[in-house]
From Swiss-Prot:
Chain spans, region Disordered: 20-71, 88-116
Bias-annotated ranges (Basic residues): 88-99
Gene from which the chain derives: TAF1D
Domain of life: Eukaryota
Subunit structure: Component of the transcription factor SL1/TIF-IB complex, composed of TBP and at least TAF1A, TAF1B, TAF1C and TAF1D. Interacts with UBTF.
Subcellular localization: Nucleus
Coiled coil: none
Species of provenance: Homo sapiens
Protein name: TATA box-binding protein-associated factor RNA polymerase I subunit D
GO molecular function, one term: DNA binding
GO cellular component: centriolar satellite; cytosol; mitotic spindle; nucleolus; nucleoplasm; RNA polymerase transcription factor SL1 complex
InterPro entries: TAF1D
């Protein structure tokens, strides 16, 4: 708001105060005289648009006054957009960056790898089918399908791991036999035969020691050259069936024969009916 507007407001307020004082002094003499309400500039709501709008009175006052060097800029759409852009630029400057720039270049450096040669290498790797198998050449199959190659490779890997397992087992067995002072047996026997042989096959299998009485009986038997012993027939099961079981078996045979005869009769009836229909 310019200086002329402020002077006019001060003049209006001073006039209102003088009228109020006069009305207070003359209220005792005249009761019918009306009083003037003082003007209160604070109570009114100021319109913000009036700051930028220039009235003809204010223009005349600004021309007449020598102190009023500042003139308000009219509100336009262009000014609003420029103000918004300036605010946006200030906000960007104040905004902190999450990652501080290091100054290093991004991406793959140029001249390190030729994309044409990389594509050629990829095609060669895709077309190459690994090492060839000699038994396929006998079958006149130079380029085997991918499924066959996969099965052959799996079989080779399986055989390799089985052989490693066998060597590991042989190594552990040799160490255990050396600790038991039985290392001489490995020179005379094959490993595959020793693999399925127990270490205590030569000795007694049962840990219970036999009594001396049984040894004496064995010596007497050797002298007499008779190793046959008589035993009771209590453990022998008789092969004769009881009476009840035989009856049940006969009844089952009869029922099976009756069922077979019924089936034959029904089949004969069905065939006769079909012949009549035809």
């Amino acid at each position: 708001m310019d200086k002329s507007g402020i002077d006019s407001l001060d003049h209006v307020t001073s006039d209102a105060v003088e009228l109020a004082n006069r009305s207070d002094n003359s209220s005792d003499s005249s009761l019918f005289k009306t009083q003037c309400i003082p003007y209160s500039p604070k109570g009114e709501k100021r319109n913000p648009i009036r700051k930028f709008v220039r009235t003809p009175e204010s223009v005349h006052a600004s021309d007449s006054s020598s102190d009023s060097s500042f003139e308000p800029i009219p509100l336009t759409i262009k000014a609003i957009f420029e103000r918004f852009k300036n605010r946006k630029k200030r906000y960007k400057k104040k905004k902190k960056r999450r990652y501080q720039p290091t100054g290093r270049p991004r991406g793959r450096p140029e001249g390190r790898r030729n994309p044409i040669y990389s594509l050629i290498d990829k095609k060669k790797q895709f077309r190459s089918r690994g090492s060839g198998f000699p038994f396929l050449e006998s079958e006149n199959e130079k380029n085997a399908p991918w499924r066959k190659i996969l099965t052959f490779e799996q079989a080779v890997a399986r055989g390799f791991f089985n052989y490693i397992e066998k060597l590991k087992y042989e190594h552990h067995l040799k160490e255990s036999l050396k600790q038991m002072n039985v290392g001489e047996d490995l020179e005379n026997e094959d490993f595959d035969s020793r693999r399925y042989k127990f270490l205590d096959d030569d000795g007694s299998i049962s840990p219970i020691e036999e009594s001396t009485a049984e040894d004496e009986d064995a010596t007497h038997l050797e002298d007499n050259e008779c190793d046959i012993k008589l035993a009771g027939d209590s453990f022998i099961v008789s092969s004769e069936f009881p009476v009840r079981l035989s009856v049940y078996l006969e009844e089952e045979d009869i029922t099976e024969e009756a069922a077979l005869s019924k089936k034959r009769a029904t089949k004969a009836k069905n065939t006769g009916q079909r012949g009549l229909k035809m």
